[in-house]
A protein has these predicted regions:
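Intrinsically disordered, compositionally biased, charge-dense segments
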Residues: 1, 5, 258-289
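Helical scaffold of the NTase/Pol beta-like nucleotidyltransferase catalytic core
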Residues: 1-39
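Well-ordered, non-membrane alpha-helical segments in soluble/globular domains
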Residues: 15-24, 64-70, 133-143
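Residue-level detector of alpha-helical secondary structure
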Residues: 21, 28, 67, 211-214, ...
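Active-site nucleotide-donor binding segment shared across nucleotidyl transfer reactions
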Residues: 24-64
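Short secondary-structure junctions
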Residues: 31-40, 66-86, 153-161, 165-167
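Conserved catalytic core of two-metal-ion nucleotidyltransferases
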Residues: 71-120
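Catalytic cores of NTP-dependent nucleotidyl/adenyl transfer enzymes across multiple folds
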Residues: 100-265
Length: 289
């Protein structure tokens, strides 16, 4: 076995949905832990998956022994050091006739991600192809944007760069859940002004169940958290128009969203707004004339 430092494992490719269970079953028997029911994201929901992320409920002190066990398994061909345990394994029942846009190699990357499986399934949830046109990351960015706007209380006093001296708001955390925080700028060590960093103090018990998260954010149910589309429909139903627009504008300006591509419906709405404003301006000119 070779050990690599982070990044994608060499020689791996997508796995077909029919190959996921046979591949994980082999590892389950050796590791004696449930892998199939702890897959994350879009694994098992789409025809092909680029890799397999699995939630691993394990104590931090037990991770070295788990890694040693993986190293001893012939099924683990390569391993990489990262914040997760990255491995390369052979795809069981590999069907070469099933192809996708990326090359299939007969091997797949499986990432073991230590943490709370229940919460990780909520955070890394990804809708199926029939439920959304967009990647699961859009859903998480939308939730994070909602957290930045909904029930946000900023102090009137600001620092030189425009940040409020204190802000109480929601935050979408991959480790802690939905948390209510008090955010303050971090002062420079010399006492002269502030750094670009913020200090986030959790002021309420973290929320980790989907229904409770939806309720805290003023939505109807866990189903509202399913996808970008369901979240957009939910905020349009439950929030004031000005807040909805602020959330959608913030979402569309997100760098990752722009890199992937702003959703078509937001482009259309923005064009309609521009045309409406242009029409209002034209009418104003006519009235002056």
């Amino acid at each position: 076995m070779k050990l690599f430092e982070g990044g994608a494992m060499p020689g791996v490719g997508p796995i077909h949905i029919d190959e996921i269970k046979p591949t994980l079953s082999v590892l389950e028997k050796k590791l004696e832990i449930d892998l199939i029911n702890n897959v994350l994201g879009s694994v098992g929901k789409k025809e092909f998956s680029g890799d397999i992320d699995v939630a691993l409920q394990i104590k931090p002190d037990d991770i070295p022994a788990f890694v040693d066990k993986l190293k001893m398994m012939p099924e683990i061909l390569d391993m990489a050091k990262s914040s997760v345990i990255m491995t390369k394994v052979k795809i069981e029942n590999f069907d070469q006739s099933k192809t996708t846009s990326k090359p299939r190699t007969g091997y797949v990357q499986i990432d073991f991600m230590p943490g709370d499986p229940g919460w990780m399934k909520t955070y890394y949830h990804s809708p199926s192809d029939t439920e959304s046109k967009y990647k699961g990351v859009f859903r998480n960015i939308m939730i994070a944007t909602i957290c930045a706007v909904y029930q946000r209380n900023d102090s009137e006093e600001t620092i030189d760069d425009g940040r409020p001296v204190e802000s109480e708001r929601w935050m979408w955390s991959p480790t802690d859940g939905l948390v209510r925080i008090k955010r303050t700028p971090v002062a420079k060590k010399n006492g002269e002004g502030y750094t670009k960093k913020n200090n986030n103090e959790i002021v309420q018990e973290p929320i980790k169940t989907a229904d409770a998260i939806a309720k805290a954010l003023g939505l109807d149910s866990a189903e509202d958290l399913n996808s970008y589309e369901s979240l957009k429909a939910a905020i349009e139903k439950n929030y004031e128009p000005a807040m909805v627009q602020k959330i959608l504008d913030g979402f569309a300006k997100n760098g990752q969203v722009q890199d992937i591509g702003v959703p078509d419906d937001l482009k259309t709405e923005e064009l309609d707004r521009i045309q409406e404003l242009a029409g209002m301006s034209l009418n104003s000119v006519r009235m002056i004339c």
